[in-house]
Amino acid sequence: MSTSPAKFQGIAILDHKDWKNPKKVEYEPKKFLDHDIDIKIECCGVCGSDIHTASGHWGDITKPLVVGHEIIGTVVRLGDKCTSGLKLGDRVGVGAQAFSCLECGRCKSDNEPYCTKSVWTYSTNYEDGYNSKGGYADYIRLHEHFAIPIPENIPSHLAAPLMCGGITAFSPLLRNGCGRGKKVGIMGIGGIGHMALIFAKAMGAEVYAISRTSAKKDDSIKMGADHFIATKEEPDWATKYFDTFDLIVVCSNSLTDINFDVVPRTMKVGGKIVSICAPEQNEVINLKPFGLLGVSISNSALGGINEIKQMLDLVSKKDLKIWVETVPISEKGVKEVFERMDMGDVRYRFTLTDYDKEFFT
């Protein structure tokens, strides 16, 4: 039985040239399919991807653009062939992915984000041409596989940023052996970086927070960092930390400021440098030959559904608390977070809240 409306409402970008002035709109949701669910949204985290997409940094947009892929809400409709075990009224989270084929080798090996038929939660076309709409809205409709139950002891406003930013931080740590006895560097202590720091510490690693200046040193220590490196204030830092790291996760907004002539020298033989960076569309980096150092440089995108469940289990069992500021959703509220995100004025994530007041009164 459906308890969702025929049309959804959202706070949308109508022109990327005027992206900081979003407007409330009404729109048709995608066609409801047998394995789809509808979710009434409670809150939604604000991700850097929202800014890149809204501003046109990643290319032109299909309008109206409703961003948001760190969604927490309640299941209000289930398709006739749903088999995931979700029930009406369940609190679930949705991240950056709304669909994949679930049949290819990548999907069957828990690598859904790497499926060639992936549809992202917003600004991606389904096979029928419908352009997906995200979580700055009253409801969202998507395949049941990509809605994940949230443990009871994780508050919704803290759970939301985990669904994209959190798993983006957690996946490279999990896949690259973060744990006891390992020395792990987190480069870039922003929204994702601060979560990577908290996770790495909870996983048992010796954690080094790496930032350009010491401005975030106190915060990093409070988050659990064992060491702090300010690269601009310690010109010889790579020499000092030669042969130190098993893993460095690069969480910066851009790779152009990362000196790849220097960073590999800090790695142990067999060490891994993994970037989660998704910079502007026109960014290019040049890598010089970095010698016979036995170091790997790679990238990571999101994480599979099972990895998200493992992350939520870690957060729940360890009672981890990420640093979040809440802002009520509205045209004014979204404008505020866009402006502050663009200026870097956030410590360390935003969650849009008060959906009932904006959409359901």
For the regions a protein language model found, what residue spans apply to each?
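C-terminal hydrophobic helical "lid"/dimerization subdomain
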Residues: S2-A6, D261-V262, I305-T361
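Glycine-rich beta-strand-centered segment in the early N-terminal region that forms part
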Residues: E28-C44, H57-K108, P149-I154
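N-terminal Rossmann-like NAD(P) cofactor-binding module of classical short-chain dehydrogenase/reductase
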Residues: G93, I248-V249, V274
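NAD(P)H dinucleotide-binding glycine-rich loop of Rossmann-like/cofactor-binding domains
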Residues: S100-M187
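Adenosine-nucleotide cofactor-binding segment
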Residues: R180-I189, K201-D261
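N-terminal Rossmann-fold NAD(P) dinucleotide-binding loop
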Residues: G193-H194
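Helix-to-beta-strand junctions that scaffold the AdoMet/dcAdoMet cofactor pocket
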Residues: T266-V269
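Rossmann-fold dehydrogenase core element
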Residues: K272-V274, I285-T326
